[in-house]
């Protein structure tokens, strides 16, 4: 990792101290810093490195147009975000491990920036050879697990036993969490899935109610109601998390709530578009002026 072990971000929520090595976050909100001192970059950024994926999940909302981001351009964007106060970057896709320089990008972010490095993967390419290149270069790994056992195999078309084997390799490299798409097919697996997460040592269980796509209408109201009740009664040891778009409905607590919108989060698509989230189709193209110029342009779009 970079010699920088901690970072201080100033924004509308206060002064935010963050250590990417330990994961410690401390928000000093007793005094509101003047607006002129606020950092300009979003607190967190996600980047779809490529649209390529070798799974065909019916509910996937990622674009299917072939696109892969250039390594050198990506490095420039990461440096910009770092210099302007972002705390972390999450690589996704598609399947990020299919980017030809995936390991190099993780190394650049770890060695040349002070950003916390995470990525989301289906996990099946995270074999020991690749994982050995990621040691000390990623801070957290998210594995997508929609359903468990036979449900997982039906929806993802891959062996659940193979997924478990990859998971056990992953946990030797970095702390990990499980991403769980909630819909009519998976909601009955919630209890078994959270038990599995606990038994395997997951640090977080991210609930992702299915988003609507041109092919599917998203999670139904009946399933939403069941999910809300499940969250309300949850008493397990694995930390629950939820996407920002569903946070209010599921009663999530956000200590940085004053830092919302583009101050909290932004997404870059594999087509080099800066967006407010990965679920949105609108955004602005990132041109030669850089990603911060694109951010200023996006802020003007209501």
PLM segments and residue spans:
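Secondary-structure transition/capping residues
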Residues: 60, 68, 116, 163, ...
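Alpha-helical interaction segments
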Residues: 7-8, 67, 142, 195
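Short, intrinsically disordered/low-complexity patches at protein termini
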Residues: 122, 201-202, 213-214, 298-301
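N-terminal pre-core extensions flanking Radical SAM catalytic domains
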Residues: 1-64, 82, 253, 257-279, ...
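Radical SAM enzyme [4Fe-4S]-AdoMet core and its adjacent flexible, acidic
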Residues: 137-140, 144, 150-275, 279-292
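N-terminal hydrophobic or amphipathic segments with adjacent small-residue motifs
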Residues: 17, 87-88, 117, 141, ...
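Conserved alpha-helical substructure of the radical SAM core
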Residues: 9-10, 19, 23-121, 125-132, ...
């Amino acid at each position: 990792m970079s010699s920088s072990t901690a970072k201080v971000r100033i924004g509308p929520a206060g002064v935010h101290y963050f250590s990417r090595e330990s994961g410690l976050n401390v928000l000093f909100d007793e005094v509101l810093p003047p607006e002129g001192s606020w950092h300009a970059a979003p607190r967190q950024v996600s980047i779809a490195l490529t649209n390529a994926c070798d799974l065909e999940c019916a509910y996937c909302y990622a674009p299917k147009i072939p696109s892969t981001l250039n390594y050198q351009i990506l490095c420039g964007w990461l440096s910009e975000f770092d210099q302007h106060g972002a705390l972390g970057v999450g690589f996704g896709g598609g399947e990020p491990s299919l980017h030809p320089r995936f390991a190099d990008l993780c190394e650049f972010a770890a060695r040349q920036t002070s950003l916390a490095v995470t990525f989301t993967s289906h996990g099946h390419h995270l074999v020991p050879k690749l994982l050995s290149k990621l040691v000390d270069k990623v801070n957290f790994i998210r594995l997508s697990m929609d359903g468990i056992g036979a449900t997982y195999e039906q929806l993802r078309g891959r062996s659940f036993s193979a997924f478990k084997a990859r998971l056990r390799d992953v946990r030797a490299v970095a702390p990990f969490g499980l991403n769980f798409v909630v819909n009519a097919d998976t909601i009955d697996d919630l209890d078994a899935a959270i038990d599995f997460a606990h038994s395997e040592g997951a640090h977080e269980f991210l609930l992702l109610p299915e988003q609507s796509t041109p092919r599917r209408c998203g999670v139904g109201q009946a399933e939403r109601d069941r999910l809300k009740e499940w969250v309300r009664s949850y008493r397990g040891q694995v930390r629950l998390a939820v996407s920002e778009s569903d946070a209010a409905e599921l009663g999530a607590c956000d200590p940085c709530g004053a830092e919302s919108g583009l101050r909290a989060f932004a997404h870059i698509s594999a087509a080099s578009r800066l967006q407010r989230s990965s679920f949105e189709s609108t955004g602005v193209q990132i041109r030669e002026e850089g990603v911060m110029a694109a951010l200023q342009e996006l802020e003007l779009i209501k």
